[in-house]
């Protein structure tokens, strides 16, 4: 009875760790990873590790598109990747395209929230790369609050009065060198490089 309960518990844990997306699985420490098999081969292409299963699934979709074309079965059939592929891509190029497409997921979610539409994203792999790179997104900052500051706000608004400090024009007197009657202040036996 106890063994059966333990087996059921393990089975539930394993199904919870499984993803509902193709090519995606969850690591024990919580990261979602994605990889894809090459057609007619046992070799796999590692597509990366992601924070969410959706990003990992989008990476799989991009690799699926690069390897099998637009008629492949995607995790997100309503939002297939739009990657321009003029020639067959190398595994590092597929990794790069998959990473770029996966990381555009946040932009799509933001676009859905703002407009209710899913914007199409076109990705063009440039030159061959030896490693997958992650696309960076630019953030627009709103600096309109600077208009509220007074015009003379800045370094020129600080006074030049440093009354708490000396002006630096009075230096401490240099102490005179005293004669110690032939005694040297430096012990010559301590010199490291005595050749």
Curated annotation (Swiss-Prot):
Organism domain of life: Eukaryota
Pfam family, one: AP2
Cellular localization per UniProt: Nucleus
Biased composition (Basic and acidic residues): 1-13
Region annotation Disordered: where it falls in the sequence: 1-22
Similarity remark: Belongs to the AP2/ERF transcription factor family. ERF subfamily.
This protein's name: Ethylene-responsive transcription factor ERF018
Protein species of origin: Arabidopsis thaliana
